[in-house]
From Swiss-Prot:
Organism in which the protein naturally occurs: Gallus gallus
Segment forming the signal sequence: none
Oligomer and partners: Homodimer. The cytoplasmic dynein 1 complex consists of two catalytic heavy chains (HCs) and a number of non-catalytic subunits presented by intermediate chains (ICs).
Protein known as: Cytoplasmic dynein 1 light intermediate chain 1
UniProt-listed PANTHER family: CYTOPLASMIC DYNEIN 1 LIGHT INTERMEDIATE CHAIN 1, DYNEIN LIGHT INTERMEDIATE CHAIN
Sequence ranges of Low complexity compositional bias: 1-24
Ranges for region Disordered: 1-34, 370-424, 445-515
């Protein structure tokens, strides 16, 4: 019994040991399984995180005319106040940050020079293996709207020509074109209650898009499919007010311009954004649209067509009917009018800049005048004054006929008589004229018929002598010189002098006879 009991006891101990060994093996196997599961979880998480990580190698290519504001636009998006413009092709970048996964990357930005001479540099910006990761941005200067359509057509043809040179396989190119068409058709206008911060696209949104009804494309939609997204950015929209004031642009002109640009965007499946770096308008909108197209962030900003200087039309929203609404406001323009004939370049106004005249110092000016006066020869202190009295109208006063008849018989002043000194003053000149007049009366010849003898010795009898003469006053001897005007003026002044001094004074005998 005891042996049995020991044996049983032994047997019992051996059985329990076997059970313990089995459980230990199970635990070891379970730990190995847990370890494998842990590593598999870590690997799957890393692989999932790598798949959800923001991709690198995305790029934006800007094309447009010189001075359109391409570098200024990217500098404003970066938040850089001072930036330097390059030549040929500039390289910049945009920081892209995913707030949900705390991940960030850089989006390459290349800006091509506005001169077509540099279009060969596109081979460094658009390669065959990276074309699907590229977004084209066509920049239009709205301060010069008459260049808008030519600029868009020119740079779009440059891109098309370069893509054709890449010789991408037809299957791959067709897949890119179909993706662009699908994105255009699957656009859904966001509601009013959209989130403010961008988030990654989730599967539920994708499933909703798959279940949504896809509408067919219009006749003029995506007729020029490049296979990559295109954005048309109109810069310097703050110049719209300047165009209204200086060039008489009206709302219908801006609607006409917008309608033509939107038709172009329909052909290429492009979005349209009006911006202003000066007024910081829609700058953040451009950045959000870029990261939505390249990195898949949902974009929840609705279209804006009411504000003429802040228009935003995402790709897939527009169609021909919506563009036709703009035509309803046309008064002088028509929808079928040519863009070049309706939006013309205004004539260039030549501004004449007058030279600024700097006033010199008074003392310097006076010294110059003094030196000029010193170089000039000494001139007369006064000039001979015309003694003939004038009426207020400025015409000489006609002397009395009686005085004229007396003067007609007076002989001219001899050549050797005293002349007026030019250096005399005005008063001295008048006295000289009077002296010459009386000297001529004293030196007259007598005895000739019709001559001075009929006048008498005094000027007062001139009237009688004039009336007693048989010859008319106009009858003169051949060779007789005309009577001096100064003598006539002096006689007229002497005859009127009593009236000017005292209106109540009695008339002189000469005036009585003359009257």
């Amino acid at each position: 019994m005891a042996a049995v009991g020991r044996a049983g006891s032994f047997g019992s101990s051996s059985a329990s040991g076997a059970a313990n060994n089995a459980s230990a093996e199970l635990r070891a196997g379970g730990e190995e399984d847990d370890g494998q599961n842990l590593w598999s979880c870590i690997l799957s998480e890393v692989s999932t995180r790598s798949r959800s990580k923001l991709p690198s190698g995305k790029s934006v290519l800007l094309l447009g005319e010189d001075g359109a504001g391409k570098t200024s636009l990217i500098g404003k998006i970066q938040g850089i106040e001072e930036y330097k413009k390059g030549r040929g092709m500039e390289y910049l970048y945009l920081n892209v940050h995913d707030e949900d996964r705390d991940d960030q990357t850089r989006c390459n930005v290349r800006i091509l020079d506005g001169d077509l001479y540099h279009k060969g540099l596109l081979k460094f910006a658009m390669e065959a293996n990276s074309l699907k990761d590229t977004l084209i941005m066509l920049v239009v200067d709205m301060s010069r709207p008459w260049t808008a359509m030519d600029s868009l057509q020119k740079w779009a043809s440059v891109v098309r020509e370069h893509i054709d040179k890449l010789k991408i396989p037809p299957e791959e190119m067709k897949e890119m074109e179909q993706k662009l068409v699908r994105d255009f058709q699957e656009y859904v206008e966001p509601g009013e209650d959209f989130p403010a911060s961008p988030q990654r696209r989730n599967t539920s949104l994708q499933e909703d898009k798959d279940d949504s009804v896809i509408l067919p494309l219009g006749a003029d939609t995506l007729t020029c499919n490049l296979g990559i997204p295109v954005v048309v950015v109109c810069t310097k929209c703050d110049a719209i007010s300047v165009l209204e004031k200086e060039h008489d642009y009206r709302d219908e002109h801006f609607d006409f311009i917008q309608s033509h640009i939107r038709r172009f965007c329909l052909q290429y499946g492009a979005a349209l954004i009006y911006t202003s770096v000066k007024e910081n308008k829609n700058i953040d909108l451009v950045y959000k649209y870029i990261v939505q197209k390249l990195y898949g962030f949902p974009f929840n900003v609705p279209a804006v067509v009411v504000e003429k200087d802040a228009v935003f039309i995402p790709a897939g929203w527009d169609n021909d009917k919506k563009i036709g609404i703009l035509h309803e406001n046309f008064q002088t323009l028509k929808a079928e009018d040519s863009f070049e004939d309706s939006i013309r370049k205004p004539p260039v106004r030549k501004f004449v800049h007058e030279k600024e005249i700097v006033a010199e110092d008074d003392q310097v000016f006076l010294m110059k005048q003094q030196s000029q006066l010193a170089k000039q020869p000494p001139t007369a202190a006064g000039r001979p004054v015309d003694a003939s009295p004038r009426v207020p109208g400025g015409s000489p006063r006609t002397p009395n006929r009686s005085v004229t008849s007396n003067v007609a018989s007076v002989t001219p002043i001899p050549a050797g008589s005293k002349k007026i000194d030019p250096n005399m003053k005005a008063g001295a000149t008048s006295e000289g004229v009077l002296a010459n007049f009386f000297n001529s009366l004293l030196s007259k010849k007598t005895g000739s018929p019709g001559g001075p003898g009929g006048v008498g010795g005094s000027p007062g009898g001139g009237s009688a002598g004039g009336t007693g003469s048989n010859l008319p006053p106009s009858a003169k001897k051949s060779g007789q010189k005309p009577v001096l005007t100064d003598v006539q003026a002096e006689l007229d002044r002497i005859s009127r002098k009593p009236e000017m001094v005292s209106p109540t004074s009695p008339t002189s005998p000469t005036e009585g006879e003359a009257s």
